[in-house]
Swiss-Prot record:
Gene Ontology terms: biological process: cell division; cell wall organization; peptidoglycan biosynthetic process; regulation of cell shape
Pathway: Cell wall biogenesis; peptidoglycan biosynthesis
Classification via InterPro entries: Mur-like_cat_sf, Mur_ligase_C, Mur_ligase_C_dom_sf, Mur_ligase_cen, MurD
Gene that encodes the chain: murD
Molecular function terms, GO-annotated: ATP binding; UDP-N-acetylmuramoylalanine-D-glutamate ligase activity
Name of the protein described by the UniProt record: UDP-N-acetylmuramoylalanine--D-glutamate ligase
Keyword Cell membrane on entry: no
A single cellular component GO annotation: cytoplasm
Sequence similarity: Belongs to the MurCDEF family.
The EC number(s) this enzyme carries: 6.3.2.9
HAMAP family: MurD
EC top class, as a word: ligase
Amino acid sequence: MKSNFSKFKDFIKYKKVAVVGIGVSNRPLIKFLVKLGAKVTAFDKKHREKLGSISLELEEIGVDLVLGENYLDKLDGYDVIFKTPSMRIDRPEFVKAKESGAYITSEMEEFIKYCPAKVFGITGSDGKTTTTTLVYEMLKKEGYRTWVGGNIGTPLFANIEEMKEDHMVVLELSSFQLMTMDVSPEISLITNLSPNHLDVHKDFEEYVWAKKNIFKYQSSNNLLVLNKDDDLTNEMENEALGDVLKFSLVEKVYNGACLSNNKLTIQGKEVCDSKDINLKGRHNIANLLAAFCMVNKYVSIDSMKYVATNFSGVEHRCEFIREVNGVKYYNDSIASSPSRTLAGLNSFEKPVILIAGGYDKKIPFEPLAEGGYDKIKILILMGDTKNKIKSAFEKVISHKKCEMEIVIVNSMEEAVKVADNIAEKGDIITLSPACASFDMYPNFEIRGNEFKNIVNRL
């Protein structure tokens, strides 16, 4: 049973509240808390000069600022602390604050707890954004007032008073957001699981544990959607508290969705033929099947079919940019893990020129090398992980006694220039980094946009 938002309003009024992080996603939260009568202090590692005009904007509405390298040293004396998702709650500063009586939470935890609308939550290692968007589009097509947020869209907590019980909310949730959750969405999905974010999580087991929070607090009338083709997620059926639907690309599924004789079906009913889908790759068929399971109770087959046959993809996800001198360029900047890059490679019918590399999340690249060596014509590497990826591929190339040209570059501009010089008519060049962007770019969108800008200047 969800709590009425008036309880939160009564709770937060006049409280001393710390908001850690003054990033774009936290700014609406800060302003909303001020509007609700909280005494807000915003904390950030950046100095005033780097924050720019937002520092003055916040001070004008009565927000105190704590800035600079040692900003977390001043967390004492607050009633409530909203932490940014990527910060571990076992940091000494948070532990000390909690021991002193502070309530530590996050925007997403409070949103799910008080949101009056039905909440669809999507997590997993790969396919989250596409599946979130598919669910959103299907619900919208059916006529529901639908909101989308979490890792995509806009921060939703500040809009919670506009939401009603007959509205729908679709959230993409990361392991960081889920780590401290003690509340779960009514309809939850885990797309798949493979090692990821091991630069933040202690190990893969903790990463999986965090993902499970998406269904751990469900009730008996809630729904969990699981990938039958993924051993880890398939076994989670035993831990489910409510109903379970599964999806599969390789097995017949009667209680869920599957691909059968090239037809996408849900609960035995045909939705569409795979040849009529705009999205490239079998991984996107899996994303569609997962979405069908999530919306099955709320959306007609006609609405599912419309979205499945008309949706052409999300920006930065195997996105076709242009063809230059017979060479096709694709932007798959969202691919921040080896498994996501491998899925992208599998969507092409011939080996490609791959541009990869970036920030090191401490995850292995051997699975990418072993599964992708025969799908890559030339490998162009950049970023912090370039030598790590090179080493993984060289081992496989040596073991398989095959050949592959590997080129090391120092920038995106150089990567595209090298690819353009090497490519022959009929080739495909794709940016699919298998890594996060933080060594060179603030996020994958900026990385993808730079790649597109360079390609469009060719």
